[in-house]
Amino acid sequence: MCYNMEKYTEKKQRNQVFQKFIKRHIGENQMDLVEDCNTFLSFVADKTLEKQKLYKANSCKNRFCPVCAWRKARKDALGLSLMMQYIKQQEKKEFIFLTLTTPNVMSDELENEIKRYNNSFRKLIKRKKVGSVIKGYVRKLEITYNKKRDDYNPHFHVLIAVNKSYFTDKRYYISQQEWLDLWRDVTGISEITQVQVQKIRQNNNKELYEMAKYSGKDSDYLINKSKSL
């Protein structure tokens, strides 16, 4: 997995902004780690120096650090890709990518909304039709911030393993409208207008990165100091 120095520079610059946000929330020793985060990078390379791989770095490992979160997302995406390849080859399964969302909420409602999301998802997978098609899943919570409205949108990205026959067997296939109806039912929110569901195509890394990236985008939580963290 080659290292993207351009992306690293962008994330390191965001780390400078992050330091101002996090300072009042952590101790002096942890703050030193955040300030020095990824100032030392050691690489291994091939003979031509065209391919380089990060070997060692001084990471702060703070879950909100833009650099550390980006590196973890890349690592998780690779892990997901390897897992999917194994399950496809050994277990003969396919995958669908499901995104579940609800209307935005204000900051003081966010904690309760996340709890409600988790409860609703548990109800969803216990539904007979859903439970019969899911052979395994990976779920990630992502929270985005709308600067204009000053509100938040928590939503789930779910990678679901299904039998190959799922897409052709009408007894088990769940259409987008059915997913929407099920999600509306378990949340009790009829105002939900859409869910997104699609089959994962081979070698498509976009969905994997959506799954792997951190639950809050640094572009969102570094906007408003009074609302963040």
Swiss-Prot record:
It comes from the Bacteria. GO terms for biological process: DNA replication. Keywords: DNA replication, Plasmid. GO terms for molecular function: DNA binding. DNA binds at Y214. It holds the Pfam family Rep_1. Belongs to the Gram-positive plasmids replication protein type 1 family. Produces a single-strand nick in a specific site of the plasmid, and this nick results in single-strand replication by rolling circle mechanism. PC194 is a plasmid that specifies inducible chloramphenicol resistance. This is Protein rep.
